[in-house]
UniProtKB/Swiss-Prot annotation:
The active site is at D65. InterPro entries: UDG_fam1, Ura-DNA_Glyclase_AS, Uracil-DNA_glycosylase-like, Uracil-DNA_glycosylase-like_sf. Pfam families: UDG. Belongs to the uracil-DNA glycosylase (UDG) superfamily. UNG family. Keywords: Cytoplasm, DNA damage, DNA repair, Hydrolase. It is found in: Cytoplasm. GO terms for molecular function: uracil DNA N-glycosylase activity. It comes from Limosilactobacillus reuteri (strain DSM 20016) (Lactobacillus reuteri). GO terms for cellular component: cytoplasm. One of its GO terms (biological process) is base-excision repair, AP site formation via deaminated base removal. This is Uracil-DNA glycosylase.
Length: 229
C-alpha cells in the first residue's frame, strides 16, 4: 500500500492502515472530500506525525478535531496556518504561557517550532467538514489515534502527555501512568479556561518532567514570524 507517513510512524501505524476499519474510513473520506468541503486539505492530514517522528516525541498535546474554518487546520492540534487570526483557545494558551514562563505572545498560530522539538500536536479525529464541529467523529480516526497514544505510552522512553478538557482526559486510560507523566486541566477554550486551565502551569511542569528524565526542555517561545522550514 502507498506509504502515508514518511518516517518511523509508518511502521508503528501500518497495522492500522491495513485494517478493515481504516478501509472503511478511507472510503468515507473519498466520498467526503469529493462532495463536501473538508479540512484540513488532504496533504495535511498526517502533518502532526510528519513533523514529529515517533522516536523524537517527548510531549503530546492532545486536541479533539481540526478547526473547521477556512485556511485554519493543517493537521496539528491547536496550530493554524500562517496568515490566519489566532483562535481563542490558542490565545488563552499564549496567555498561560506568558504567566507560566514569561513567553511573549505572538500574532500567529503556527506551532511548528514546538513540533520540531518533539511536541506531537495530535488531534483524536484528523478531519472535519467545513463549519461542522465533530462531524467526522466515530468513523475510525479515534482507533488510529488511540493506537498512536498507546504506542507512545508503551515506548521505553517516557512521554509527557498534556490532556486539556474532558475529551482529552478520557484518553488517560490508554496511557501507562507508571512510566509516563500525565498533566491534566480544563480546556483552554474561553468557555472553560477560567475553570482550571489558567494557572495550571503545564509548560513549566512539562520542562521540569523532561529535565528529571534527562531530556532537553522545550523552548516554548515561538518566533515572531512563522517558521516555514
Amino acid at each position: 500500500m502507498k506509504q502515508l507517513i514518511h518516517n518511523d510512524w509508518w511502521e508503528v501505524l501500518k497495522p492500522q492502515f491495513e485494517s478493515a476499519y481504516y478501509a472503511q474510513l478511507h472510503n468515507f473520506l473519498k466520498e467526503e472530500y469529493t462532495h463536501q468541503t473538508i479540512y484540513p486539505e488532504m496533504h495535511h492530514i498526517f502533518e502532526a506525525f510528519e513533523w514529529t517522528p515517533f522516536s523524537k516525541v517527548k510531549v503530546v498535546i492532545l486536541g479533539q478535531d481540526p478547526y473547521h474554518g477556512p485556511n485554519q487546520a493543517h493537521g496539528c492540534s491547536f496550530s493554524v496556518l500562517p496568515g490566519v487570526p489566532v483562535p481563542p483557545s490558542l490565545q488563552n494558551i499564549y496567555k498561560e504561557l506568558q504567566s507560566d514562563l514569561g513567553c511573549t505572545p505572538v500574532n500567529h498560530g503556527y506551532l511548528k517550532k514546538w513540533a520540531d522539538q518533539g511536541v506531537l500536536l495530535l488531534n483524536s479525529v484528523l478531519t472535519v467538514r467545513a463549519g461542522q464541529a465533530y462531524s467526522h467523529r466515530g468513523h475510525g480516526w479515534e482507533q488510529l489515534t488511540d493506537a498512536a497514544i498507546h504506542a507512545l505510552s508503551e515506548r521505553p522512553k517516557p512521554v509527557v502527555f498534556i490532556l486539556w478538557g474532558r475529551a482529552a482526559r478520557n484518553k488517560k486510560q490508554l496511557i501507562n501512568t507508571k512510566t509516563n507523566i500525565v498533566l491534566e486541566s480544563a480546556h483552554p477554550s474561553p468557555l472553560s479556561a477560567n475553570r482550571g486551565f489558567f494557572g495550571s502551569r503545564p509548560f513549566s511542569k512539562t520542562n521540569e518532567a523532561l529535565q528529571a528524565m534527562g531530556e532537553q526542555p522545550i523552548d516554548w517561545q515561538l518566533p515572531a514570524e512563522p517558521n516555514y522550514r
